[in-house]
Amino acid sequence: MNSVRKTISSRILYVICMEVQYFGRYNAFLTVQNTSATVKIPVEISESEVEIMDTNIMKRNECLAKTVIKGLESRNMSGYYAASKEEALKQALELIPEESTIAMGGCVSAREIGLVEALEKGNYNYLDRSKMSPRESLMAAYDADIFLSSANAVTNDGILINIDGNSNRVSCIAQGPRKVVFIVGINKVCSDLDSAMKRARNVAAPVNAQRFDLNIPCRETGKCFDCKSMDTICCQFLITRFSRHTDRIHVILVNDTLGY
């Protein structure tokens, strides 16, 4: 690895580090590209080097989260940083009083940190929408104490971006439930509103199209076609740039890759 460091730029090395951290393994491919070809060169990385990389990435993620939290606070929203899924679960439960009524959209991130399981086992009134009709679920969610969600993207300065097909999720974020708790992986942080919208439309939407087996172009191509299909998942776009109601919106930023 040291010999490789001498021949590649720090920027390319950083990309390799991110790939190692993401895949959680001790080898990676260095991608070298010019105008005529792209070549992948296997690179071996020791366990100690991976630990150093992971530490540096974690420090960067924490700094980034602090920037986002500052932006959220300037918009009358609360932000928190969790260094792990376990910390995220602990923080989420601190925001959810026992015996409260909790609703949720199809939030993969909440499941990934173990929050749904904890609510089902604990002293909470967790509304399982799979046991209700869509209309019953929506009406119950509007009157809930807590609504759980993730975001399709969040900007460095604290703007939340969400796209919805049936609009149950974005409508509950906008109004209704007394408190909204977001579980957001650091992978969803984007530099600005434009890049956040691109992520929502070209990453989150195509993946969810696969997840729900929708008959729309992005399911086949992996990118947005701005379609008007009856199955389109991009019916409503919600940009949350400020919360008029203090203590309503809480965002937990997690040092992990969560959701889509």
Which residues are covered by each model-predicted region?
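Polybasic, lysine-rich low-complexity intrinsically disordered segments
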Residues: 2, 6-7, 34, 41
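Short, Lys/Arg-enriched N-terminal segments with co-localized hydrophobic residues
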Residues: 28, 38-52
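Glycine- and acidic-residue-enriched helix-capping/strand-helix junction motifs
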Residues: 52-61
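N-terminal active-site beta-alpha-beta segment that forms phosphate/nucleotide-binding
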Residues: 61-148
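Conserved phosphate- and dinucleotide-binding cores of soluble alpha/beta proteins
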Residues: 142-260
